[in-house]
Amino acid sequence: MKNKLIAKSLLTIAAIGITTTTIASTADASEGYGPREKKPVSINHNIVEYNDGTFKYQSRPKFNSTPKYIKFKHDYNILEFNDGTFEYGARPQFNKPAAKTDATIKKEQKLIQAQNLVREFEKTHTVSAHRKAQKAVNLVSFEYKVKKMVLQERIDNVLKQGLVK
């Protein structure tokens, strides 16, 4: 009888202990998520400046052999790692536009010339302007396929209106 009473009391104490630890651990875990009050703004010589004006010296111990990985990406290209240190991220890559070759310059000039001749044909509605504009549009490179189709549609719209003799 005494043994059963002691066993039941130990079980109740254990159950109470388990519930209190789970409640406490979930309360602690909920604090880590959500918006952060302090966000790093700049890093200079291992000193991190936060947006509220405070500073913190950061160091990664030499004996820390845990692999380093990115935990969070902040504004201003600042990375926070799993060990609590901060670094600037990699600089963004900018693709420089390729220098235009003579061939591409000539193709662009043909496109511009075709646009000018189509504009002139829209104003005059003459047969000679139509021939010049149609020839120029036909000579436009296939690389400007969409613009070429637009120019051809403009010519067709003028032809629907009729030519002036």
Swiss-Prot record:
Q: Which domain of life is it from?
A: Bacteria
Q: Where is the signal peptide?
A: 1-29
Enumerate the GO terms in the molecular function aspect.
Answer: complement binding
S-S bridge residues: none
One GO term of the cellular component aspect? extracellular space
Q: Where in the cell is it found?
A: Secreted
Keyword vocabulary terms for this entry: Secreted, Signal, Virulence
Role played = Extracellular fibrinogen-binding protein that plays an important role in virulence. By interacting with the alpha chain of fibrinogen and its derivative fibrin, enhances a non-functional interaction between fibrinogen and platelets and is responsible for repression of fibrinogen-dependent platelet aggregation. In addition, assembles a fibrinogen protective shield around the bacteria which results in impaired phagocytic clearance by the host.
Outline the subunit composition.
Interacts with host fibrinogen alpha chain/FGA. Interacts with host complement protein C3.
Which protein is depicted? Fibrinogen-binding protein
Upper classification of the organism = Bacteria, Bacillati, Bacillota, Bacilli, Bacillales
What gene makes this protein? fib
